[in-house]
């Protein structure tokens, strides 16, 4: 059995997994929508989205747009629609999402629609990208990206603790940068889907 967490972190993870307060089943429908709004606000904020929490709530619950960039509103709407869709599929319809390339590409397409070209939405990038604030350069060769992504998706199965699996996928997909844009949003969504699969309350990253 492989671990990311140290002994103390494993104990905390076990506490979370066993706590009834961490279960999605304990949330009402209205609370789930509130959770989605909070998740989308913080996920967008990490990306530099300029919407405040109040503006985000008005946009996602009431359809009221702020006088800000179209891309900011589109980012939040895409995140919200994807998050709610996954919650309904897993929580309400009692399904489990398989974390594979097909799911990853579908989630990226849902998150990036209208923000990148149709040819790049839901497809691996064929151009080099950079991560600001670091000297690390993600692989730029398509075959190398495919190979490393395959390794990540294969290796996830060595983690039996869903919280460790969520962290592993989040960090490694974000580092690989398999898409032209929206990599961190997609990795946070995958992280949340892993937790949803275990009917866990997914807090903002």
Give the residues covered by each predicted segment.
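FIC/Doc superfamily catalytic core
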Residues: 1-203
């Amino acid at each position: 059995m492989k671990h990311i967490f140290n002994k103390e972190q494993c104990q905390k993870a076990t506490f979370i997994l066993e706590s009834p307060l961490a279960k999605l089943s304990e949330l009402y429908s209205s609370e789930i929508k509130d959770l989605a709004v909070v998740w989308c606000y913080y996920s967008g904020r990490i990306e530099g989205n300029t919407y405040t929490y109040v503006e985000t709530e008005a946009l996602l619950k009431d359809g009221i747009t702020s006088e800000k960039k179209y891309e900011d509103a589109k980012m939040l709407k895409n995140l919200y629609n994807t998050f709610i869709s996954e919650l309904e599929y897993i929580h309400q319809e009692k399904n489990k999402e398989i974390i594979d390339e097909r799911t990853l590409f579908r989630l990226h397409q849902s998150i990036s629609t209208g923000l990148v070209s149709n040819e790049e939405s839901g497809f691996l990038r064929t151009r080099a990208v950079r991560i600001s604030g670091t000297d690390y350069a993600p692989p730029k060769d398509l075959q190398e990206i495919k190979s490393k992504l395959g390794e990540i998706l294969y290796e996830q199965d060595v983690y039996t603790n869903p919280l460790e699996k969520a962290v592993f996928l989040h960090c490694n997909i974000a580092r690989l940068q398999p898409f032209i844009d929206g990599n961190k949003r997609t990795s946070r969504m995958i992280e949340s889907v892993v937790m949803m699969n275990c009917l866990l309350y997914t807090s903002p990253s």
